[in-house]
Amino acid sequence: MPQNPERTVDHVDLFKQPEYTELFENKRKNFEGAHPPEEVERVSEWTKSWDYREKNFAREALTVNPAKGCQPVGAMFAALGFEGTLPFVQGSQGCVAYFRTHLSRHYKEPCSAVSSSMTEDAAVFGGLNNMIEGMQVSYQLYKPKMIAVCTTCMAEVIGDDLGAFITNSKNAGSIPQDFPVPFAHTPSFVGSHITGYDNMMKGILSNLTEGKKKATSNGKINFIPGFDTYVGNNRELKRMMGVMGVDYTILSDSSDYFDSPNMGEYEMYPGGTKLEDAADSINAKATVALQAYTTPKTREYIKTQWKQETQVLRPFGVKGTDEFLTAVSELTGKAIPEELEIERGRLVDAITDSYAWIHGKKFAIYGDPDLIISITSFLLEMGAEPVHILCNNGDDTFKKEMEAILAASPFGKEAKVWIQKDLWHFRSLLFTEPVDFFIGNSYGKYLWRDTSIPMVRIGYPLFDRHHLHRYSTLGYQGGLNILNWVVNTLLDEMDRSTNITGKTDISFDLIR
């Protein structure tokens, strides 16, 4: 079909045209050596069986779609939440292009980071010269206020010593001696993106706060969001603390960086936590982490080196937000204002409106440990019944915490927690023990296609939908958003399953 410049056909419609369908069929028949359709269908059906599930869960040396990213992604994300900070990755350009692209495709925003451009020679002899030259170019060309260094597999395998390399770069005159260059070793072959976040956060805080301890507290509360990719959450946190009159510092605030306005002029480093505020965080009254499993090393460092009180509070749903606000009130002496109590009432009222559609519904969820705990806890409040909980980057500590939450609810008795399993395992679970809906990131759309189970997109990354990252998921307002996504996904599916005229449309109701 010839294209008309007045109406260009996009790929969705273009590849449905007869010439393309014929092309694809000939390609399969003459060049791919494909199995007959009947055999493909037979094997496909077998992969949905209990027999295949047992074989699937017995595999040891293969991972299929792991539902996690590698350490440098988390390290870059943590660094970009600080004012004027340029992530510098000691490794190859291809790896850094992946990290940047992964974040850019989620946020639909540019993501600035540089690479030391290590190639074959650096893989053998080390990347010292790459760093010396890269530091000079980065400092002079991009004019950052801080450069945060992390590593890829190549640099870790050869054993690059970041601390020594940075010192040599300063001695060589690439950057000033007093210029802040925190670093973190982030090997991609261990841990995940949440490990990289923790390593970089500890590296940045230890660098900026060195020698800044004072005899008296500044009276502030530090908040560490963790690997939380919803920019609306930091804004909601700031709004709630503003309403309470709490003096605070968010350690790594990337909300303006990944949701910057289009004002007609390019700004390379929008927003971020002020470096002087981060440096003074050592003198705060307490530090509250909103995620536990993205901050273990950072919290241990703050507790032992800063001698500062640390807490983990997850302000999700009614109960979680209640506990968070109560704890902040006790730490600061500030009362919880009526405005937030009214918001709580709105969430309770909304739950009452939608409760009947969620209560008793079985669901499955995969994602990062803290996200799973927060979302599952909120859904348990509404009587939803988890069946499959899968966390590839979860550990035994997470499993015990999650199982304790499930055991404390009458709706969590049938759930099973799977750690260090991937999305191909999740597929077997959905086929052998179906649920009413499942929750996950964009990679779950292939499971939605295979199983026809309704999917609620919550998590990271969200590549195939726009603007979801702008919403909040924490606090009472965030609870409304989660409730909205879940209940309306269920109602959409109800309409789809009752839309056949004269057969199922007796329940195709106008009012739900």
From Swiss-Prot:
<keyword id="KW-0067">ATP-binding</keyword>
<dbReference type="InterPro" id="IPR000510">
    <property type="entry name" value="Nase/OxRdtase_comp1"/>
</dbReference>
<dbReference type="InterPro" id="IPR050152">
    <property type="entry name" value="ChlB/BchB/BchZ"/>
</dbReference>
<keyword id="KW-0547">Nucleotide-binding</keyword>
<comment type="function">
    <text>This molybdenum-iron protein is part of the nitrogenase complex that catalyzes the key enzymatic reactions in nitrogen fixation.</text>
</comment>
<dbReference type="InterPro" id="IPR024564">
    <property type="entry name" value="Nase_Mo-Fe_CF_bsu_N"/>
</dbReference>
<dbReference type="Pfam" id="PF11844">
    <property type="entry name" value="DUF3364"/>
</dbReference>
<dbReference type="Pfam" id="PF00148">
    <property type="entry name" value="Oxidored_nitro"/>
</dbReference>
<feature type="binding site">
    <location>
        <position position="70"/>
    </location>
    <ligand>
        <name>[8Fe-7S] cluster</name>
    </ligand>
</feature>
<dbReference type="InterPro" id="IPR005976">
    <property type="entry name" value="Nase_Mo-Fe_CF_bsu"/>
</dbReference>
<dbReference type="InterPro" id="IPR000318">
    <property type="entry name" value="Nase_comp1_CS"/>
</dbReference>
<feature type="binding site">
    <location>
        <position position="188"/>
    </location>
    <ligand>
        <name>[8Fe-7S] cluster</name>
    </ligand>
</feature>
<feature type="binding site">
    <location>
        <position position="95"/>
    </location>
    <ligand>
        <name>[8Fe-7S] cluster</name>
    </ligand>
</feature>
<comment type="similarity">
    <text>Belongs to the NifD/NifK/NifE/NifN family.</text>
</comment>
<feature type="binding site">
    <location>
        <position position="153"/>
    </location>
    <ligand>
        <name>[8Fe-7S] cluster</name>
    </ligand>
</feature>
<protein>
    <recommendedName>
        <fullName>Nitrogenase molybdenum-iron protein beta chain</fullName>
        <ecNumber>1.18.6.1</ecNumber>
    </recommendedName>
</protein>
<dbReference type="GO" id="GO:0051536">
    <property type="term" value="F:iron-sulfur cluster binding"/>
</dbReference>
<keyword id="KW-0535">Nitrogen fixation</keyword>
<dbReference type="GO" id="GO:0016612">
    <property type="term" value="C:molybdenum-iron nitrogenase complex"/>
</dbReference>
<dbReference type="GO" id="GO:0005524">
    <property type="term" value="F:ATP binding"/>
</dbReference>
<dbReference type="GO" id="GO:0009399">
    <property type="term" value="P:nitrogen fixation"/>
</dbReference>
<dbReference type="GO" id="GO:0016163">
    <property type="term" value="F:nitrogenase activity"/>
</dbReference>
<keyword id="KW-0560">Oxidoreductase</keyword>
<dbReference type="GO" id="GO:0046872">
    <property type="term" value="F:metal ion binding"/>
</dbReference>
<comment type="subunit">
    <text>Tetramer of two alpha and two beta chains. Forms complex with the iron protein (nitrogenase component 2).</text>
</comment>
<keyword id="KW-0411">Iron-sulfur</keyword>
<keyword id="KW-0408">Iron</keyword>
<keyword id="KW-0479">Metal-binding</keyword>
